[in-house]
Amino acid sequence: MAGPFGFRENPHPKEEGIPPMRIYARASIIDEVNFDEMFLVTMCGMHFYKDMFGKAYPFRKYDQVFVPEHNYGAMENVGCVTFNENYLHRGETITLAKRLRFAGTNLHELAHMWFGNLVTMKWWNDLWLNESFATLLPFIAMIHSPRLAHFQPTCWVTFMQYTFWGVSTDQLSSTHPICTEIVSTDQAESLFDGISYGKGSAFLKQLYNVLGHETFKKGLHYYFDKYQWGNTTLPDFVGSLNQAWTESGDTSMGSEFDLPTWCDQWLKTSGINILEPVLTHNAEGHLESLKIKQTMGLRGNNRLRKQKISVCLFEQDGTQHIVSPVIVNDLDGTSVVQIPSGLNIKAVYLN
């Protein structure tokens, strides 16, 4: 970078596992930067990713630069991430929502130091593996970082904006599978869309839910141990997670469940699924039975998919009862939910 930039250095340079860090901005606007929060978010991310991936931050320094007229929101150059100056929100009231959004972008670019730079996709077919992971992991990092507790109450609400982007894109005639065939680099630009970011990260969130935190983390350790400083494909990634899943002995998805096949259902086909609660009430008007009916959207490959969800039951006074896990099968698309007896349920939420 060249130009009239000023910078601040990390005031906590001796914190274990943290490389030298600087934040740069044009000297004329440098006072607009919230240095304390940026350094805090970055350090929390480095600690969490080290634990999650089994590898410390892999480069010698980490600089972050606010650039005028940046073509993109941000770019994950090795050891020198660049951000559009619009993230400074100059002259605006800086709300918690805006701070959370930028913290997510900060952690997104930091995640690329592992997913993208330490391990790189072999070809554009697997662009989603870079972008989907870097979209989901910031929110898991916030939940597991006590020093970022101020973001935790609403961080998943912010994540849902990416999911809605994916849902809307997946209902267009131009939709495509998350992992799709790309024949040239010219075609690759079209993949930077709601499918690669939104639907892909939503799939990974369900994958994280299926495996559980510790098994998911163990699979990522296998992945980075084997493929660091190399190029990978979808089977490499799924194989590492499947190794951890098999070792866990978990049978919550059923004895016939095969993780690679399930991943292909989601990654290699397009289109949404719709889950609808079907309610039956007794003579007193109380909920007696609940079935979940799965149907297909109008666009895409039109297929049912196995899903692991939670169901929240609400009583009149707002008391919540969570039934989890609930497995929605991919054969007839229905699932029966066991309702606790003696409850006067007034609302049902499928998650």
Residue ranges of model-derived segments:
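Beta-strand-rich binding/interaction modules
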Residues: 255-260, 270-350
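Hydrophobic alpha-helical and helix-loop surface patches within well-folded domains
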Residues: 8-293, 298-300
